[in-house]
Amino acid sequence: MSRIQNTFAALAAQGRKGLIPFITAGDPDPAKTVELMHALAEGGADVIELGVPFSDPMADGPVIQRSSERALAKGVTLHSVLDDVKRFRARDQKTPVVLMGYANPIERMGADAFAAAARDAGVDGVLVVDYPPEESHDFAAKMRAAGIDPIFLLAPTSTDDRIAAVGQVASGYVYYVSLKGVTGAANLDVSSIAGKIPAIKSRVPLPVGVGFGIRDAATARAVAEVADAVVIGSRLVQLLEQAAPERAAAELAGFVAELRVAIDGAAKPAA
């Protein structure tokens, strides 16, 4: 099994739900990315999603767009992100790392070269926002051949056919976007999430992580009641945007630890 599959199997055996935080590589400081990844793990992350900055992040709201712009201005590239993962792996061989980004940087490198470089760096999964599942069979096969789980997005508007298409190519987990629109939006409706997950589970035999609109421990706990994992990104990127540089890692770890406690509370039956 892959590192991601092992992680979710262990969570299921413990009756726990996963916590998947997202940060943008290189923001606020390229020299601090590995330190921040360790802070996420120390706070209780089960999987880390590491954003690869891109100049036109169409699925992202203003908070993550700004973080991408800052990282690009500081020279962050797909190659430097892979270097960050390699340096993270020198100390942490347990926590899965998923790269989340857009097709253009991968296509410039070439899928085969990317798969080899990502494998060698210690990447466990890749989520390419603008790769539709129906057109991703070759890419997904190349990733799996390198031991990397191809992860795909589903949304409230996803049809049964689209869900089935994801089921044919995805591994590791699927990321259910709980809101229409862009990352960081508000107005989370947990009951609508709960209503959609059975349709996903019937066609995709993978854990379902839910993200978009999760901003605090209370919403994380509510989502953890109905999902296999909680994905949180914009709130963490905003925290890093506002934190004093010398306090960023500690504040990040502390906030993730609060989410961890809340999610673990959701996973346990009431006494």
UniProtKB/Swiss-Prot annotation:
Alphabetic keyword roster: Amino-acid biosynthesis, Aromatic amino acid biosynthesis, Lyase, Tryptophan biosynthesis
Residues annotated as catalytic: 49 (proton acceptor), 60 (proton acceptor)
InterPro entries: Aldolase_TIM (IPR013785), RibuloseP-bd_barrel (IPR011060), Trp_synthase_alpha_AS (IPR018204), Trp_synthase_suA (IPR002028)
Gene3D superfamilies, per database record: Aldolase class I
PANTHER family according to UniProt: TRYPTOPHAN SYNTHASE ALPHA CHAIN, CHLOROPLASTIC (PTHR43406:SF1), TRYPTOPHAN SYNTHASE, ALPHA CHAIN (PTHR43406)
Subunit-level organization: Tetramer of two alpha and two beta chains.
Family: Belongs to the TrpA family.
Name this polypeptide is given: Tryptophan synthase alpha chain
